[in-house]
Design a protein with these regions (language model features):
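Active-site gating loops and adjacent loop-to-helix segments of metal-dependent hydrolytic enzymes
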Residues: 43-47
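Ribokinase/PfkB-type carbohydrate-kinase core domain
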Residues: 1-39, 50-223
Length: 223
C-alpha cells in the first residue's frame, strides 16, 4: 500500500513520520478595534482607531506545518524571513506548535510575509476591514537560494517526505525561486520512495514527479 493510500485510510498515517515544509512562511495578525474608543487629535483630520486586542495565527507554510504537526508528525521548516519583529513572532508561533525552525533563515534585506487583518466592532457587529499585506518585495539573493538548497540536501535523507508551499505569484522574490523549483523537481525524481506534495497558487505547472494540491481556480490558471 502506498503512502497516499495509507494516508487516506488511516488517521494515524502521519504519526511518527518526519517531513520538511519548505516555502513561503506567513504570519496572520488579526487586529481588533472598537469604535467606542475612536478619537480625533489636533494633528490629524482623520479619526484614530484604537486596538484593544491582537491575535497571531499561522499563514501559508506556517499553517501547513501546524496541520502536519497536529497529526503526530515531526516538521523541519525551511524558508526565508526578515530580521524583524514579525519574523520573531512567526518563529515563536512555530516553536509553540513544536516545529524545528533551525532552517528558517533571517535576512536584514527581507521582509517577513505578514497579513494584517483589522476587525472593527461597531453597533455590536464586527466589520472586516481591508486587508493589509506586507510581503517581501526584493529579489531572492543567490546566497538565500543556497541556504534553501543546502538545507534541503542536508535533511532529505532523514525525512519521509517534503511539502512545498508557494503562496505568492512572483516566485523570483519567494523562497521557491525557479532555481529552487528545479532542485526540488530533481529531488522528487531521485528520491521516488519519498512523498512529495506541492501547494502552489500560480505555478503548479512548473513542478514534476510529485503530488499537486490546488483548487479549481488555480488548476484552470495553470492550464
Amino acid at each position: 500500500m502506498s503512502f497516499v493510500e495509507r494516508f487516506c485510510n488511516s488517521k494515524d498515517a502521519l504519526k511518527n513520520k518526519k517531513f520538511i515544509v519548505v516555502g513561503d512562511f506567513c504570519l496572520d495578525r488579526y487586529m481588533y478595534l472598537d469604535s467606542r474608543l475612536d478619537q480625533r487629535f489636533d494633528y490629524c483630520d482623520l479619526d484614530t482607531y484604537f486596538m484593544y486586542d491582537e491575535k497571531l495565527y499561522p499563514g501559508g507554510a506556517v499553517n501547513v506545518a501546524k496541520n502536519i504537526l497536529s497529526m503526530g508528525a515531526t516538521v523541519i521548516c525551511i524558508g526565508l524571513i526578515g530580521n524583524d519583529g514579525n519574523g520573531y513572532d512567526l518563529k515563536r508561533v512555530l516553536k509553540n506548535y513544536g516545529a524545528d525552525v533551525d532552517c528558517l533563515y533571517k535576512y536584514d534585506n527581507r521582509i517577513t510575509n505578514t497579513y494584517y487583518r483589522p476587525i472593527r466592532r461597531s453597533d455590536k457587529k464586527d466589520k472586516y476591514m481591508n486587508e493589509l499585506l506586507f510581503i517581501n518585495p526584493k529579489l531572492t539573493g543567490v546566497d538565500q537560494e543556497k541556504d534553501i538548497i543546502d538545507a534541503l540536501e542536508k535533511n532529505i535523507n532523514v525525512v519521509d517526505g517534503i511539502v512545498i508551499v508557494e503562496q505568492f505569484d512572483k516566485d523570483s522574490c519567494s523562497s521557491i525561486t525557479p532555481k529552487v523549483k528545479k532542485y526540488v523537481n530533481s529531488m522528487a525524481n531521485k528520491f521516488s520512495d519519498k512523498f512529495f506534495l506541492v501547494d502552489s497558487r500560480s505555478n503548479i505547472n512548473k513542478y514534476t514527479n510529485m503530488y499537486v494540491k490546488c483548487n479549481q481556480y488555480e488548476f484552470m490558471k495553470a492550464m
